[in-house]
Every structure is written in C-alpha cells, then in structure tokens.
A protein has these predicted regions:
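Glycine-biased, small-residue-rich flexible motifs in mid-sequence functional cores and linkers
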Residues: 2-5, 16, 86-385
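Short, small/acidic-rich helices and loops at N termini and domain boundaries
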Residues: 1-91, 274, 355-371, 375-385
C-alpha cells in the first residue's frame, strides 16, 4: 500500500467526504501531505483554514487522525470482506474523477466496480413508494439489466430495493451506502445485500465501524449520481431525497430523467416538477433511458449480444474472458489459465456474466452462442442505432 493510498484510508475515517475546503487541499497537495499535516496538528504551510469554523474542523480532524491507524483499518476491513479502492487503482470508476473530491471508496462484493459502471444507470426514488412506483422501478431495472446495464441505487426501502432486486434477476447491481460496509442498513435488506455481493458490489465512502447518520445520506447521493451517465427518478415527493440526487446529477452534467405519475399522487410531485421546469427528460420505458444515456450508434437492438466493448475491459478481466471457451470450462481452470487468483477470477466472471459476455453452464462457464469474437471489440461502433 502506498503512502498516498494509506493517507486516503485515514481521511475516510476522520473527515467528511467531499469537504469544500479540505477536498481541494487534498487535490492540490496530495493526500499524503495533508495527512501528515493532520498528524502534526498544523495546516500545510501557506494553506491556513479560511474561517473560524474551518479552524475548529481542522482541530477535530487532527485529533481523530492521531487515533487512526490506516493499516489496522485496512486489516479490519479485509476481515469483513471489504477492500479499499483509491483514485488511479484498476477498479476506480473513471467518472468519479469528475467529482470535486473523493478520498477513496470502500467496496464489498465479487463484482468489479469499474467494469460494472462502464455501462450503468442510476435508478432512485421514494422510500415510501406506491405500488405504481415499485412496479415501474422493477420493470425499468429488469429491462436495463437485460440490456447489459448495471443498476446503481442507494439500497433503501421502496424504489431502491425494487430496482436492486429486479436487476439481480438477470444482471448485477451496485448499492451505494451511507455507512460502513460491515453494517447492513436498513437491516431488513441484509439478505438483499448478500445477494448483491455475489455478482455486484456495495460501495461506501465511510469505513467499517461507521454507523449511518442522517446528513450522510445526502452526501452519499452525489456518489449515486456520479457513478453513471444518467439518473432516473421514478417517484419523488416534494421533499424527497431523490431530488437531491437529481440536483447532483445536474451539477455533474449527467442525463437526468423522470417518470411521470398520476397527477393526484403526492409521490410524483417531485418528478412532475423536474419535468415542468425542463430539468429532466420524460421517460416511460427502459428504451427511452437507453436512447438518452447511450451515444448514438452504440445502442444495439435487444438480443444483439454483449454491449460492453471488449476494448473497455481492464487487463485482468480481459484475460479471464480469453480463458473461457464455447464448450465450457470450470472456474478453477479459468483462474489457472488467466489471473492465477481464484477470488479475482470469480469477481471478473460475475462482471462478465452481467455484461452478457459469458454465461453459466454445467461445466462452469462458457461463451454465449451469440458471441462473435472477431467483432466484440467493435460491436459498439458497428451496431445500428
């Protein structure tokens, strides 16, 4: 682990994600320099806190930093099945570079976060969703998963849960939490999160041991918006947290979409406002979403085959794909012929399955019937729009 990564681990434990003063300081000087300054108690030379509140914040962060051992935190996380992904790591999603700052991500699950987010959509909405909202969330998410999209949401009751469950029926999903990944919140979704971890991932900016706090959910929402090229708001009341996610999507220049609902439903007031103000595009089916988030010429018709170009896979995942045959091969053999690491291979296979590049069979894994090796790397460019 590099000093820079170790410092970022520490920062997740002592400072709030995306802080408007500390964040730019980390971007400018590097996490290792800022972490060393926190341990010393003195701000970096020439970079004094800009206000009395910032001075108090610095003192609090400095006191907490002296009580944090990044290496022990990494060990405790590994015991809980949680890994740390820093900017620049192979699993780091490139879209997060557009955030003003993100110290790093804690990740749990067999999926590969970067690969899952290559072709993805965020689906959000009310916790107290109506039957209409639950139906639409499930229908959209299932159809998006059928078309090789990963569904990203916040793991809450209501629309989030419906979206995650539907995506799992044919693909993978990403859960973004506002607490440490050793905590299942809400508790009623512990089983759902276990299912997600088998093929997808759970993600958080907070380390293990951190319990959920109300302000953290709004901070978490910016990550949901940032991970994907587009966000769909299925249902949202006048003060719904989903509208906060929508604002982040707009700020990040992502595609914002909203589903219209009954004019008499208070759970659709927020969606109708987004549409009335021209902030969101109206979507009534998954095909509408695909047309808006996928560049012209890349939206292959349903059933045309894998929709993640092989050229966009990281090197390790590409090696795993090359070890899978048409007749089928066992997981251990794939690992032996590719990465040499069984855990990494299982994670890569889960991602490849979600992308439609491999499928399960009696022998283990095989290439789908429709796969055409010579065209994979060019499918996105040659598919009809």
């Amino acid at each position: 682990v590099t000093d820079e990564a170790r410092a970022r681990v520490g920062l997740t434990a002592v400072a709030p994600p995306g802080h408007r003063w500390l964040g730019p300081l980390v971007n400018e000087l590097g996490a290792a320099t800022v972490w060393a300054a926190l341990l010393s108690g003195e701000p970096p030379p020439g970079r004094p806190p800009p206000s009395e509140q910032a001075v108090r914040s610095w003192r609090g962060w400095s006191e907490r930093a002296r009580r944090v051992d990044p290496d022990r935190l990494l060990d405790a996380s590994a015991e809980a099945g949680v890994r740390f992904v820093a900017p620049g790591d192979p699993e780091w999603p490139g879209r997060l570079d557009e955030l003003p700052v993100c110290y790093g991500l804690w990740v749990r699950g067999m999926g590969d976060l970067r690969n899952l987010c290559l072709r993805s959509v965020s689906v959000v909405g009310a916790r107290s969703a109506t039957s209409y909202g639950l139906h639409v969330a499930a229908e959209f998410s299932c159809e998006l998963a059928d078309r090789s999209f990963s569904v990203v949401s916040g793991g809450a009751y209501g629309v989030d849960g419906a979206a995650h469950r539907a995506a799992l029926t044919t693909g993978s999903t990403v859960v973004v939490l506002a607490c440490g990944l050793d905590t299942d919140y809400p508790r009623g979704h512990a089983g759902l999160f276990a299912d997600v971890a088998r093929t997808g991932v759970l993600v958080s900016e907070w380390p293990v041991g951190r319990t959920p706090r109300t302000p953290d959910f709004l901070v978490r929402n910016r990550l949901i918006a940032a991970l994907t090229p587009g966000t769909v708001v299925v249902e949202a009341g006048a003060r719904s947290g989903a509208l906060n996610t929508a604002s982040h999507a707009t700020d990040l220049h992502r595609v914002l979409m909203a589903v219209p609902g009954p004019v008499t439903s208070p759970m659709s007031v927020g969606c109708h406002r987004l549409l009335r103000e021209g902030r969101a595009s109206c979507v009534t089916r998954a095909d509408d979403v695909v047309e808006l988030v996928v560049p012209l010429g890349e939206a292959a018709p349903e059933g045309a085959g894998p929709l993640v170009p092989a050229a966009e896979l990281d090197r390790e995942t590409a090696r795993v794909l090359s070890a899978v045959t048409r007749r089928g091969v066992g997981t251990a053999v794939v690992a032996s012929n590719s990465t040499g690491n069984l855990e990494h291979t299982i994670r890569a296979l889960g991602m490849l399955a979600a992308a439609g590049l491999v499928e399960r069979c009696e022998a283990g894994w095989r290439l789908p019937e429709r796969r055409r090796p010579k065209r994979d790397a060019h499918r996105a460019r040659s598919a009809p729009g």
